[in-house]
């Protein structure tokens, strides 16, 4: 039995998951929470207080190339014994992973798929959630009511406006959504720099390094992640005699840099309070804790104080993450978000891309551009 719950931000998807958990526990039914990525699984763990697994971990899919379609279809996944499987952030699931999930559950399993159908589809092939809903075969509940707390948020209300094809409405005060108009890319970059350098900290008393995330549609160009990361690194973590650094493939990794793991690594061990665990997931964000130049090792402290050791030759698994693509941000939320938008990239600026970016911000969203 498969059922779907879909809805935009503030419509109660997480609240319904919590209610489902309470009911299942009262009925003493075995259930499992899961999500497509490590960060999405972590977020549902935080919001529900219950452990959530990645789909890879649930199905014990490891040590295979996510892009090897034939191997993915032939892969013998672990059989899931739980009576109920709840999958959150389902818009990120591609055809191959859904195929493996269906293979892994029993015919009697209740599969509850939760997600926002209007977000970006999966990076891999297929728009699985959208196509299943469009089939009219699977029972689907669409949540439309925006509840009280979310209804006070201009971010949430305007994300819904964008989803409906309407232009956002910007206020000048008492708002969590701001628009800064710029005429050139250079002016846009200067606005980002001044916000990061001093304006945001004086306005909101936040830790810019940890609380702020810059999102952008692209990796290349002046407003892409590569160039923005270099500029933001110079502002937030400039070169210093007190900080060690290493150059790898034209990138400078420096102690205290904000970095992201960009592939799933099932062999990578990490420690928490002296205990060792395995697996670092694509999308995990952390900070370079220490660089051991003598032994050619670099240590990253990820969320939950996971300390991970990298040989210098493994640094292709890391990217700076002061700025990340909107696709990479899926399944995550950030307190403060800066979103540079310029009409030079208008072919990339689809409605669901903007909608996805807007719904990543929890406390403040600043859109900069023309």
Question: What is each model feature region?
Answer:
Residues 117-270, 274-278:
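Conserved helicase motor core of P-loop NTPases
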Residues 2:
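Walker A (P-loop) ATP-phosphate-binding motif of ABC ATPase nucleotide-binding domains
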Residues 284-370:
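C-terminal accessory regions
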Residues 93, 120, 268, 344-346:
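Short beta-strands and strand-coil junctions in structured, solvent-facing domains, enriched
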Residues 5, 33:
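Hydrophobic anchor at the beta1->P-loop junction of P-loop NTPases
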Residues 64-73, 95, 241-243, 348:
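Short gly/ser/thr-rich secondary-structure transition/capping motifs
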């Amino acid at each position: 039995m498969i059922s779907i719950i879909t809805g935009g931000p503030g419509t109660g998807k997480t609240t319904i998951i919590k209610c489902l958990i309470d009911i299942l526990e009262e009925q003493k039914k075995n259930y499992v929470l899961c999500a497509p990525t490590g960060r999405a699984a972590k977020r549902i763990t935080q919001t529900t207080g219950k452990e959530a697994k990645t789909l890879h971990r649930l199905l014990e899919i490891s040590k295979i190339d996510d892009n090897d379609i034939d191997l993915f279809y032939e892969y013998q996944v672990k059989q899931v014994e739980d009576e109920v499987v709840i999958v959150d952030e389902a818009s990120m699931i591609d055809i191959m992973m859904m195929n493996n999930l269906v293979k892994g559950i029993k015919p009697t399993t209740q599969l509850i798929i939760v997600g926002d159908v209007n977000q970006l589809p999966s990076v891999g092939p297929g728009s699985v959630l959208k196509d299943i809903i469009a089939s009219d075969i699977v029972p689907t509940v669409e949540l439309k009511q925006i509840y009280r707390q979310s209804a006070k948020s201009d971010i949430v209300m305007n994300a819904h406006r964008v989803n409906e094809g309407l232009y956002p409405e910007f206020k000048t005060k008492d708002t969590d959504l701001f628009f800064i108009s710029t005429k050139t890319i250079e002016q846009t970059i200067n606005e980002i720099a001044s916000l990061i350098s001093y304006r945001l900290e004086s306005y909101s008393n936040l830790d810019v390094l940890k609380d702020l995330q810059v999102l952008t549609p692209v990796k290349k160009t002046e407003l892409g992640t590569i160039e923005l990361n270099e500029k933001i690194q110079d502002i937030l973590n400039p070169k210093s005699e007190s900080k060690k650094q290493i150059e790898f493939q034209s990138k400078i990794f420096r102690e205290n840099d904000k970095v992201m793991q960009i592939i799933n690594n099932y062999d990578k061990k990490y420690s928490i309070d002296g205990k060792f665990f395995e697996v670092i997931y694509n999308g995990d964000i952390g900070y370079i804790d220490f660089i051991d130049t003598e032994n050619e090792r670099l240590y990253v402290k990820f969320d939950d104080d996971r300390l991970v050791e990298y040989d210098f030759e493994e640094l292709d698994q890391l990217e700076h993450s002061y700025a990340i693509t909107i696709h990479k941000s899926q399944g995550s939320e950030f307190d403060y978000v800066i979103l540079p938008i310029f009409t030079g990239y208008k072919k990339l600026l689809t409605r669901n891309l903007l909608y996805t970016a807007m719904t990543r911000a929890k406390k403040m969203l600043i859109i900069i551009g023309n």
